[in-house]
Every structure is written in structure tokens, then in C-alpha cells.
Amino acid sequence: MSSRGDWHNGAMFSDQQRHGPLHLPGTSSVGVLLLHGFTATTASVRDWAHAVHEATDDAGAHPGVRVPLLPGHGTRWEELAEQPWQAWRDAVDEQYWALRREHEHVVVGGLSMGGALALHTAARREVSGVLLVNPALSLVNRMARFSHLASPVVASLPGIGGDVKKEDALESTYDRTPLAAVAQLNVLMHRTVRMLPAITAPTVVFRSEVDHIVSGDSADLVAEHSSGEVRVVDLQNSYHVATLDHDAPLLERISRDAVQRFSRGERFLPEDPS
């Protein structure tokens, strides 16, 4: 389901405690950076962030967690249409360096486009681990690759949010998808795929068996081309926005366990993460 309304006056995003940036301070050696998806807000990953924050090291300290609201999100779809992909990258870098000032190790993670940004960061920065939920490296709609040609004449198409199997779950997204922003997402995905061999950190990829937005090829690309250890966890009862779906408790538990391992300086992953 998708929560939509009068996006032009910002009413649907007025609750900053739900849709705005999130910072959960921690004193362990690990900081975690989690990133939301395309046209959505931090609301889609807040429960995931709080679950990860519950991880503890041997001294009982919790990790610090940061969840930024990416440029062009949580306002109007027209504002998203004006953002170059580098604006998203730079916003993520800013939060990465903030965590590096506070913690010895940084774990990056994200949902959908946020997963692509997490991978892009892991290829360029020193990270201790990567957590991905249906990362956007290949889209189900193959026509999306031509968005750069269509955007000058077609500003937007109906929204793509709300791919959740759980009936009472709500994902707050724009009711329109700006094609100019899709074109920028395509650039990000293409560049990220080329950079995958530069990633050496252990990576957990949560992949929904049914995803109407991101192709399952995305997880395969990470597993085949990343230079680090990769574990793919198949989610059998969730659609694209798995952080709000039936399998959320499973991915939260595995993510929390992974962060606890990283806090102890362990870079390996459990043999069976499920």
C-alpha cells in the first residue's frame, strides 16, 4: 500500500519525526548509515534503523545510526526532478564522514535506490560491512532506461511506491514519478554496477522473491561482482519494500547480528544468515 495525498502543500510529509532525518546516538565502535529509496522518505527504513540500534558490543554499547532524508525527497516531486544523482551521493558522503568522526567503523546499508547509494559508497570509502534490501541496480520496467529521452516531453508518470505485500503497511511516497529523476537513477545504477569489484566489505543482500520494482538480477550482480564476501537472503513473504513487510523481523534480526559481529571486529558473515 502507498500513502498518498496533496503532495504539493507538503501535508503528507509535515511529520518530520516520521519523514525527516533520523539520528540515534551510540557509543560503540560502529556507526551505521541507512538510506531510504527513490521517491520515499526515511519512514520506510526507520524501524530497520531502530532495530540495528539495538545491537550491542561486548561492553553493551550501541552503534550510532544515521538516516538522512535524501535531496529532493519529502517535499514535492518537482523538486526531485531537479536533483542530479551527485546530490544524493554528496548527501550520503556528508553523513558517512559524520559517522567516521564519531566511530571507528562504519556500516552502510539501504533500501532500493538507497542500496545502490550504499554500494556506491562502499566502493569509494572504507566500510566494515554492507546491508542491502532489494538494491536498485536493475529495474523490472525495462522502459525506464529510456527515461532520459522521454523526460523533455513527459515530466512524470504515476507513482511507483507502495509495493508492499502486508495489507496494513503504508509506504509514503510521491504520487508522481519524475522521469528526469529516473534518468539520474539510471546513471547512478550504471556507475555503481561498474564499481562493484572495488567493494571488499562483507555484504548481506536481502532479496524479495516477488519484487515489482527491482529485478532479482540486482542481487546477482552484487554476488557475482563484489570482491567481498556476499550472503544473499531470500525473503519469501515480502515485496519490494521489505523493511515494512512480513519479513521485516527476519531482516532486522540478521542486520542486528551482522552489526554486532562488525562491532567485535569480525569481518566474516555467518554461514547461514537466515
Q: Where are the predicted features?
A:
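Gly/Ala-rich beta-loop-alpha elbow adjacent to hydrolase catalytic centers
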Residues: 110-114, 118
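Catalytic active-site module of serine/aspartate enzymes centered on a nucleophile-bearing elbow/loop
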Residues: 236-274
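Catalytic histidine neighborhood in serine/cysteine hydrolases
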Residues: 62-66, 220, 224-241
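Active-site nucleophile loop of the alpha/beta-hydrolase fold
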Residues: 131-142
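Conserved alpha/beta-hydrolase "acid-adjacent" motif
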Residues: 212-218
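Short, surface-exposed "cap/lid" segments of acyl-processing enzymes
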Residues: 11-76, 205
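Short beta-strand/loop motif that positions the catalytic acidic residue
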Residues: 199, 205-207, 211
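Active-site nucleophile elbow and catalytic-triad environment of alpha/beta-hydrolase enzymes
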Residues: 17-19, 178-196
